[in-house]
Amino acid sequence: MTAANACRDHHQRRGESATAGLQGLSGGEGAGAGQDGLTGPQSVTFRVEGMAPAPQGSKDWLPNGGMRESCRNVKPWRELVALEAIAAKVPLMQGPVRMSAVFLFQRPANHYRRDGTLKPLNPSLVSATSREAPLFHCVKPDYSKLQRSTEDALSRLAYEDDARIVGGSCDKRWCVGDERPGALITVIPLGGG
C-alpha cells in the first residue's frame, strides 16, 4: 500500500476527506506529543522502526535515457515513515514547522567484543578501533539525503509541503541498547498561517 493510499484510507475510515488531512486531530492525541513548553502542546514525536533509513537524491541513468533513484529502499522508507505518522495521529500542521530527526543504523560486528558485548562508546571516533566503538554514523548515506526522503514522506501528512519546514536538526548515529534501525522524528508547528 502506498503512503498516499494509506492516508486516503485513514481519512475515509474517519469520515474525513483526503484533503482534510489530519487537521481535526490535536497534537496531544499523537504518541509523544510535546507538553514541555519547549516544543509546545501541538508538537508530535514518533518512532519509525523496522528498516534502515534510506537516502533520496542520487539518481542513476537508465539505458533508455530515463533516471531512477539510486537507492531502491527510498519508496519503502517513505511509505514506512508515512504509515508511522498516521499511526501516531500526526496532525496536518498549518504554517511554518520545524522538523528534527535522529536516524538510527544497525551496528556492524566490529563494534562488539568477542563475547558479544558492545565496546565502550567514543563520540569522537569515526570508525571502530580494537577497544572502542563510535557513537555517530560517519559513513554513507549523507544525512541531508536522509532528511530529504523523510521530509518528503511527511508532505501532506504533517505539513502541506516540505517547503513549510523552516528549521530543525538531524543526527545520524548507531543503535545503542535495544534500539532498532529507523528514526525518531519530531514535528513542531511554529504558528502562523
Map each language-model feature to its residues.
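Acidic, proline/glycine-enriched N-terminal capping motif
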Residues: 2-193
